[in-house]
Curated annotation (Swiss-Prot):
Domain (IQ) ranges: 784-813
Domain Myosin N-terminal SH3-like: 33-82
Name of the protein described by the UniProt record: Myosin-1
Chief place of localization: cytoplasm
Keyword terms of this UniProt record: Actin-binding, ATP-binding, Calmodulin-binding, Coiled coil, Cytoplasm, Hearing, Methylation, Motor protein, Muscle protein, Myosin, Nucleotide-binding, Phosphoprotein, Thick filament
Protein residues bound to ATP: G179, E180, S181, G182, A183, G184, K185, T186
GO cellular component: myofibril; myosin complex; myosin filament
Amino acid sequence: MSSDQEMAIFGEAAPYLRKSEKERIEAQNKPFDAKTSVFVADPKESFVKATVQSREGGKVTAKTEAGATVTVKEDQCFPMNPPKYDKIEDMAMMTHLHEPAVLYNLKERYAAWMIYTYSGLFCVTVNPYKWLPVYNAEVVTAYRGKKRQEAPPHIFSISDNAYQFMLTDRENQSILITGESGAGKTVNTKRVIQYFATIAVTGEKKKEEPTSGKMQGTLEDQIISANPLLEAFGNAKTVRNDNSSRFGKFIRIHFGTTGKLASADIETYLLEKSRVTFQLKAERSYHIFYQIMSNKKPDLIEMLLITTNPYDYAFVSQGEITVPSIDDQEELMATDSAIEILGFTSDERVSIYKLTGAVMHYGNLKFKQKQREEQAEPDGTEVADKAAYLQGLNSADLLKALCYPRVKVGNEFVTKGQTVEQVYNAVGALAKAVYDKMFLWMVARINQQLDTKQPRQYFIGVLDIAGFEIFDFNSLEQLCINFTNEKLQQFFNHHMFVLEQEEYKKEGIEWEFIDFGMDLAACIELIEKPMGIFSILEEECMFPKATDTSFKNKLYEQHLGKSNNFQKPKPVKGKPEAHFSLIHYAGTVDYNITGWLDKNKDPLNETVVGLYQKSSVKTLALLFSGPASADAEAGGKKGGKKKGSSFQTVSALFRENLNKLMTNLRSTHPHFVRCIIPNETKTPGAMEHELVLHQLRCNGVLEGIRICRKGFPSRILYADFKQRYKVLNASAIPEGQFIDSKKASEKLLGSIDIDHTQYKFGHTKVFFKAGLLGLLEEMRDDKLAQIITRTQARCRGFLARVEYQRMVERRESIFCIQYNVRAFMNVKHWPWMKLYFKIKPLLKSAETEKEMANMKEEFEKTKESLAKAEAKRKELEEKMVALMQEKNDLQLQVQAEADSLADAEERCDQLIKTKIQLEAKIKEATERAEDEEEINAELTAKKRKLEDECSELKKDIDDLELTLAKVEKEKHATENKVKNLTEEMAGLDETIAKLTKEKKALQEAHQQTLDDLQAEEDKVNTLTKAKTKLEQQVDDLEGSLEQEKKLRMDLERAKRKLEGDLKLAQESTMDIENDKQQLDEKLKKKEFEMSNLQSKIEDEQALAMQLQKKIKELQARIEELEEEIEAERASRAKAEKQRSDLSRELEEISERLEEAGGATSAQIEMNKKREAEFQKMRRDLEEATLQHEATAAALRKKHADSVAELGEQIDNLQRVKQKLEKEKSEMKMEIDDLASNMETVSKAKGNLEKMCRTLEDQLSELKSKEEEQQRLVNDLTGQRARLQTEAGEYSRQLDEKDSLVSQLSRGKQAFTQQIEELKRQLEEEIKAKSALAHALQSARHDCDLLREQYEEEQEAKAELQRAMSKANSEVAQWRTKYETDAIQRTEELEEAKKKLAQRLQDAEEHVEAVNAKCASLEKTKQRLQNEVEDLMIDVERTNAACAALDKKQRNFDKILSEWKHKYEETHAELEASQKESRSLSTELFKVKNAYEESLDQLETLKRENKNLQQEISDLTEQIAEGGKRIHELEKVKKQIEQEKSEIQAALEEAEASLEHEEGKILRIQLELNQVKSEIDRKIAEKDEEIDQLKRNHVRVVETMQTMLDAEIRSRNDAIRIKKKMEGDLNEMEIQLNHANRMAAEALRNYRNTQGILKDTQLHLDDALRGQEDLKEQLAMVERRANLLQAEIEELRATLEQTERSRKIAEQELLDASERVQLLHTQNTSLINTKKKLETDISQLQGEMEDIVQEAHNAEEKAKKAITDAAMMAEELKKEQDTSAHLERMKKNLEQTVKDLQHRLDEAEQLALKGGKKQIQKLEARVRDLEGEVESEQKRNVEAVKGLRKHERRVKELTYQTEEDRKNILRLQDLVDKLQSKVKAYKRQAEEAEEQSNVNLSKFRKIQHELEEAEERADIAESQVNKLRVKSREVHTKIISEE
């Protein structure tokens, strides 16, 4: 636990993350009795805290905190943890681990708003339902780089750990955020993305691209902005969540090698399309609709031609229209800015809004039924005009396509009429399709924008998918979502419980396998395995006559009673019908299968789709352009369709994407975050125990903690452990001898003072218990700190000793000087000493004069030699200038060539990538070829059968040929007859279709009765079985128990055997996987090393050889395909002959059908009569409704009159009040009488229903007779349908073969072109590579020559050093310059060669890219052809669906006619009663009005919670308003008592009025709901205002934080500059010390020689003045020589080092390439074996299924529903309190923002002032030190001048001049050689440039040829399409002629 000071870095988030120091101390000092403090089970709260009173006989008596005394069993009593574990951050550290401890820890942390808690290896988060300040920028920086144990639990800590694992382990990571709907997954996903975008920023702005519009932000901005856009179009309000994700997404964030953001992409899964057109009452549609209508941007309202009222649009107003927690106006601005940041163009932005508005208008399209027809027609065109305008269509064409779509029948298109229901269904399907495709297109555009093409190495994936859902109405979408969650939970269980324990076994650790009972395979297999739910659904979709009922029956047959997870639900009143139930891990869900077949097939109106494709809105045309665009649109759904499938259903596509997701997750290292819902009412701070416990059990939280505590969650390889932790005890591992890593790790751990039971040694790794690795890290940090402090102490001691030695030397030298000075001062005034000073110079004056003369002569000679040397030097300088100019020119050329070589290297990398892609494509092609071969084999078998049949038919053909001449003469006459017959056939087909529909309706009714009968029989059988079982149960229990024991023993034996086999298989697989992992690690290391290498020429040669081999293989494959094409052509000709024979057979069958049609004419007449009667009844019904409306209008008028009269008579109300009170009791009695009369009416109604049932039985008998009559017709239609399907199948096969032939021919042409181009490219590449290899060899040869010359020059330099001895060494300076120039030129030429090679490679890659583009165009053609075939099948299915809908419509019409008949009977009775009681009807109507007005007052009474007495008093007050009518009412009462018959009539009227009153009550309830929603809306507006303020403050704080970050960066730069200046200062001080040492040495030498030179110096002063200038020049030359000598040494070292590194790199490159190839082959074989073993393991695991826990009790839900009303009031109060609190927080935040701004300004000023002053001080200090250095150098020069005044110096100078002449001649020769080499290099560079020009011309030529090839391909494609059309026309003509 960290202190409060350490938590200060988290700012205001600290109290929400960790307990304070004070709380921790209080918890430790809190009194606690471990024996008596317990949790006990409680029926209401699940568990409560209690104190044990006594323990007796296995039972415990305890007293709860509430004061109640309870007695429970021992197993229901759980010990409490000590107080120091309260609010513990990692629940795995608790002493007592059980459900109540985990529950109360989460509850106490949640009460303190600590929403994140570690649970072993993963994190648990509880939804706070409010905003918490734990996601600020300062929190992000605080978590950056922190270990898990160093910081409190947080989603940022999980994210940072994943980021650090990715960098250290070099492995892809994934973060799985799971939980039920409304648990907070989406919010946590956004926080993870925010964290990565903050810590891994690139800081680079994207370049502006012409295709995608202006760029508005960096990559991290775009990643963050993708969320608001996707949420606007993909999130909606549900019952459990205001911002529920209605689609799944997997966000991959890619990072470069340095850990910076490189790119990102998003994969989406299963958008809930049905929400576009339908919402439940408590839900609403997607946010974007309501954002647009929020009127934040009025220009959008005008552009989309819409209003701001959502209730004006049917598609978006079926549920709620506002959400309290969402500000639609603010969200609209966020969505709009996200569109701009993500680079959408203005046209794309407008088209997005237009298509969204068009979807809203689609919901308002109205259609009506034509009079006396079933055909639909538009009911007004205003809405259609708006929708068509927004979609760029013609409204007339749109309406025509909807009402009269064109359907393909055979080879012709037919216009088909649609009913109103069919048109509405088509409109809904189109709206959903437009919205879905637009959403997928937006995801694809976002991915395109986020793909920066930067190099990327690893990624972190974040999964946010819709949570587990249990609604009242659960459909196909909920099944897919729940299945996904089931798979993810299974992945979690497998990763946490199975793989973990398998690794222990594999590593040889002693471990007993623990079965946690968390296997979900049974439910998963029930859904996805063969003959599972999805399989049966897809099978039913393939049958055109399949219905929801047949689908349900198949499910029951296959799974009911056979699978424990599949059940038949019990009907519940008030809830929608459910057809089957599945027991999921999170509970039992009831599913309704209505419309699943249509949802799965997802049919569309093809005529409207054709209009969309021609739309003027480019985006809409792109969305529906075909499969090529659809594939591109499909967001994260990479890859096309599976081969061989004509179309793909929604469930198949969903499963394919889910399998891809699971594959991605298995290839990563997962990190789990479990989101928990605390309560169902979205109340902040409240936690429902049972709900949380259920989620903890389902999610495996307790099991995860247990395996974390029992197991070894941390592990590390032995070599890594030895390398990292060797520092803890280096003496444990002996130096100088090799020791195995495992043994070294064992010795190291054995020598450390830790608990040795906390770790285990495996075969390859050492395993640690939880927390031990953190302890080792702390020990390592402490040890490193000790070592560093010791090193620093030793360095400081050494420096102190050196300084002390210097001080001692200075002291001795000072003493020496003082002694000599004192001695001289004592003797200088002696007379003899003065005489000595005078005589001493005179003694040697003569000698000195001679010496001076000689020296003058020598001086003149040296002057002449110096002048000559100067002249030569000038000549050499001129030559050097010329050479420098040439060198600069060469450098420019070499630089250009280096650039080209760099380009060539990049192309080489791209070639490797394209090679891998080509290999993958070749594999796909081979697989397709194998499939085609299988299909070909099947076709050949069919062909042989057909040939046999043809041989039989040929005999008949011979006979027919004889009669053919006669038939041709009668052809013209028969053609007319045939036309008439075809028309009659069409009519008969329609009648047959109608009859079949009626028959199906009858069959369904019959089936329903059979089902009911079967259900009743099942109930009887179950009752009898239960009875017999209960009777036999007592007798059989003992026997069954013994049998169960035996069976259990047998099962345990079999289980042990299977476990042994499983373990063996698992061990073998784990060994293989371990080897694979090691190989992968080695491979990754080698790849990382290879990425840093520069030269890849040898790899290119190997690639070229492999490509040649592949080309040869492809050529052979093409030849085989050509042979197959020829065989297919021959089979096609035979098949055409067979098709003509079949068409003749069809004609014969049609003639038979015509004969059979006569038998059904009587039935047709009966049907016509029934239809006429039906139309008559419908007209009567319409007339009755008109009469009803007229009477209602008259009654309304009377009501208005009575209201006016009552208004005038208000004054009389007071007088008649007493009378009304008397009549109150009388009216109560009347009401009782009316109730009794109602009971009699209900009995009469029951009798009528019995009569209806008898009539229905008679009708069923008639239907059975009709079925017998139609059986013959059905047989004939079945034969005809079979023959038609066979003919269609043959025609489809022929079309497929045609397309296959054309495709193969195009593929052949493309391959031949590619082969020729690749041959040319290979030849050019081989030539270029040979030239480059030759150039490389010559360069190496030149390097060898230079190395030899360099060695010779070293010897010469040594001679010069010995000879010169600090003389004039300018010649050496020239020599070193020439050497460095030569080395630089060789390096520059090598770089130029590399650039040329890179340029060549770029050209080749471009050619390959163009070839790939051609191949992709061919693929798109093929996909288009497949899509056309799919669309044809979809059309047939839509026709079948339309027929089914027609059948349903007719059944409904029949039911309506029956009810109409009943209505007419009751209407006749009503008219009879009205005649008898017309005199009383007006009075009763007034009474009814008074009663209705009393019900109107009911709303206010309910709000005020008044009782029944108040309601009755209000009723009497309303009746009192009748005024003058009271006396008439008394008369009415008397007449009612007298006339009993009239009372019965009045009772019927009263029944109708009561029904009306019930409607009024419903309206009142609706109004109450509206008031409630209005209150919620106001609360939401307040919340939105508060959220807005919060967001504003957060933005301000974020801006302040960014400014602070910038200031921190500037301060860091200043510190870096300061450090650099300090380094320079240290160097200057070192130079100063060196100069001081030189000065001290000079002084010592000076003292030694001073005594000798005293006599001669006086005489030589005058003579040497002329030589001082020359000596100063010599000193300068010596300094230059020393500097040049140092440079030579450095250059020599660098040259040798680079040469060695180059050779090593080349050798490593060769080794790595060979290893890569070897590892690749091994890896492929290992993958294949792994797949086989995985399938075996999955089969073995399938035999060990466990029972899934049961779901929540329904009683708890009922209790929660009862308490909802009370909770609403409490929520209102809490929200008011929170709003006041947030208002105060707002003011505090504003004040803090101002303070922060003020502090920031002060910090900026201080930083600027402090930085400038410090820099100025450092610069002044540097200048002072430079001055000191210069002064010391001057002193040193003066000292050298004194030392060099000796006679031998002149002789040495003469000797040196002679040696210089020789060296100059030698250097002259060297210069000539270097010039010749430079010329040779120039020639090579010119040749390389010519070669690059030739390659560029070839590239342009190839590019031109490629463009011509593309044009030819387009022309050929158009010709093929024309020929196809012609062939179809010819085919139709042939059929019509036959």
